[in-house]
Regions:
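Active-site residues of response regulator receiver
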Residues: 55
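C-terminal output helix
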Residues: 89, 107-117
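Charged docking surfaces used in two-component/phosphorelay signaling
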Residues: 18-26
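Short hydrophobic/Thr-rich beta-strand motif most characteristic of the beta2 strand and flanking loop
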Residues: 28-35, 43
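Acidic catalytic/metal-coordinating carboxylates
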Residues: 35-36, 62-65, 83-86
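Short amphipathic alpha-helix used as the core "switch/output" element in two-component signaling
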Residues: 42, 64-76, 93
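Receiver (REC) domain active-site loop signature in two-component systems and cognate sites
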Residues: 58
């Protein structure tokens, strides 16, 4: 039996998780979605995720702090940063602190699926579904 990829999505905009959760589940990935960074960090403390997708700008805790906490717990976890406020400086900081990739909003679910697929391959996961949604 093949090991399932475990992925956490953290974005304080509810629509993001509602769109991305099902899109990534179609790939055969086990997805947990959070809007509250405190709850997400608690869950990250309880379970090691293979991939974490986090927004950078959130209230209370920013995505860079989430990135640092994830990497401190498990260096193998691939962290994908998403933001509507993309700048070269923010991208450089995130990548410099160990982010796997950086995606600027707005993006299509297929864009994220492609990055997740690359992250999964980097972790040694094979056979993820490359589902392409026709209207995304």
């Amino acid at each position: 039996m093949e090991k399932k990829l475990h992925l956490l999505i953290l974005d304080d905009e509810p629509i993001v998780g509602k769109r991305l959760g099902p899109a990534l589940s179609k790939m055969g990935v086990e997805v947990e979605v959070f809007e509250d960074p405190h709850q997400a960090l608690k869950r990250i403390g309880e379970k090691t995720f293979d991939i974490v997708v986090t927004d950078i700008r959130m209230e209370d805790i920013d995505g860079i702090e989430v990135l640092e906490k994830v990497k401190a717990k498990s260096d193998h976890t691939k962290v994908i940063m998403i933001t509507g406020y993309a700048t070269v400086e923010v991208a450089r900081e995130a990548l410099g602190k160990g982010a796997f990739d950086f995606i600027a909003k707005p993006f299509k679910p297929n864009d994220l699926r492609e990055v997740v697929h690359r992250a999964a391959e980097a972790l040694g996961f094979k056979g993820l579904s490359r589902v392409e949604a026709s209207r995304e």
